[in-house]
Amino acid sequence: MTRTDDPAARRRRATYLRGHGAERLALLALLLKGYRPLARRFAAAGGEIDLVMRRGSVIAFVEVKARPTLDAAAAAIDARKRRAFSRAARAWIARHPWSAGLTLRADAVFVAPRRWPRHLVSAFDLEPS
């Protein structure tokens, strides 16, 4: 069996590509709202942040979720994901000390087929260390 014949490998690749597409769509939606990208797929401290965006004095750490429905996307951010996300956000802040004086928040963008992405401001609190 070749790699392309493996159904599990095909599913993983499709999921990976769907995630990248959702992140690009989320980025476009946020750009149209006046945000500037600072980082994409920032990984550190056992967590990952899909997008780090800035608008004025706000730094938004953005989790992008693509699911069949917007409600399913919202439900996909569980406590474990929030903890890992918060660890990565603290690592990003430590590497960018200039950001400490700005408003920092955790946003989410939910993406569903044939729908414009939904941006949820302050979707959850960044957990302290």
Swiss-Prot record:
<dbReference type="InterPro" id="IPR011335">
    <property type="entry name" value="Restrct_endonuc-II-like"/>
</dbReference>
<comment type="similarity">
    <text>Belongs to the UPF0102 family.</text>
</comment>
<protein>
    <recommendedName>
        <fullName>UPF0102 protein Mnod_0024</fullName>
    </recommendedName>
</protein>
<dbReference type="InterPro" id="IPR011856">
    <property type="entry name" value="tRNA_endonuc-like_dom_sf"/>
</dbReference>
<dbReference type="InterPro" id="IPR003509">
    <property type="entry name" value="UPF0102_YraN-like"/>
</dbReference>
<dbReference type="Pfam" id="PF02021">
    <property type="entry name" value="UPF0102"/>
</dbReference>
<dbReference type="GO" id="GO:0003676">
    <property type="term" value="F:nucleic acid binding"/>
</dbReference>
